[in-house]
Amino acid sequence: MVAWKDLERAEPEFAARARRLFDAGRHKTIATLRADGSPRISGIECEFAGGELTFGSMPGARKGADLRRDPRFALHGPAFHPQEGKEAEWPGEAKIAGRAVLAGPAGEEPAGDLFLADISEVVITRLNPEATLLVIESWTPPRGLRVVERE
């Protein structure tokens, strides 16, 4: 299992930027797979604690049922759009993909499921300093960090 602390050890600066982007707002978006294989998008909150990325699901929530059946997920941090004329100041956005590992009941009421993220990829999308190129930074455990620029 690849925990958040593994990314922090491998790429501390990249991990810190990704976490700042996730911590910039309370509400995130998670994509899960329905029983028929079609995608489901749901709002969610997550927490970075003890070197782990965790998130929960309330009792009876469809996203929790999705994750118990098929643990694959994609998590998108809060979205903030670049301001016109100030595009170079946009911090970007972060995404995390992986598998949700059921860790037991959530510690808060209402009781639900607590999941740990087994991370397969972390991506930061931003603009270059001149705001002329899209910069995609992605990290995977086997490959490490890669940076691609696009017009």
Role assignments for model-derived ranges:
Residues 1-24:
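Extreme N-terminal tail/first-helix region
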Residues 25-59, 75-77:
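Short beta-strand segments
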Residues 41-43, 93-97, 136:
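Well-ordered beta-strand positions in beta-sheet-rich domains
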Residues 115-120, 129-151:
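Flexible glycine-rich active-site/ligand-binding loops centered on an Asp-His dyad
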